[in-house]
Structures are given as structure tokens and as C-alpha cells.
Amino acid sequence: MPRKQRDIERGLVNKGFQRTESHHHFFVYHSCDGKKTAVKTKTSHGTREVSSYILQQMARQLYLSKIDFLNLIDCPMSRHQYEEHLIGLAKIP
């Protein structure tokens, strides 16, 4: 179940992640009140399709199961639900 990198990046930005550029595209989560958090993931510049393995790794970086990560980027999981999940895990205050 590979996904297009463009769709993943768009989904992350829509859920409160802000993109920064370097040798990779980094996405750092900013809480609903605008505070930067330590929750982050990255995508490569050269990849158009993201493999199932990489999706699993990105999910782990964001403290989600692979299914929940796909729900986050495909929109069934809202930003508020994701933030509540992170608060429940004590990853953000």
C-alpha cells in the first residue's frame, strides 16, 4: 500500500506539521496552540512513491500504528484526535 509522497506531505501539513527544508523535507508538529513540539518525521527529496516499509517507519516516528498514520494523512483522524493521542502518551504537554 505505497502512497504518493506529495499526498503524505499535504496530509501532514493539513494536520499541523510545518515543513522545513534541508537535505530532506522535515515535518515538525506544532500543537493547536502553535507551540513547536519534538514530534517529527521526514521525507526524501528524490522519492515519488513511499514504500510500505517507510510508511511504517514514519508512523513509528509519529507515535502511531501504520493504520493510524494512514488515517492521519488520509483525513479520518483529525488534528485534535492526533493531539489528544500525543497528550495521552505524554509526548506533548
Indicate residue ranges for each PLM-predicted region.
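Amphipathic alpha-helical segments
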Residues: 1-18
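A short, structured beta-strand/loop element
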Residues: 19-60
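Alpha-helical structural elements
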Residues: 12, 22-24, 64, 77
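Charged/polar, solvent-exposed surface patches and flexible loops
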Residues: 10, 14, 60, 71
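C-terminal structural segments of small proteins and small subunits
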Residues: 61-88
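Short acidic DE-rich linear segments
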Residues: 90-93
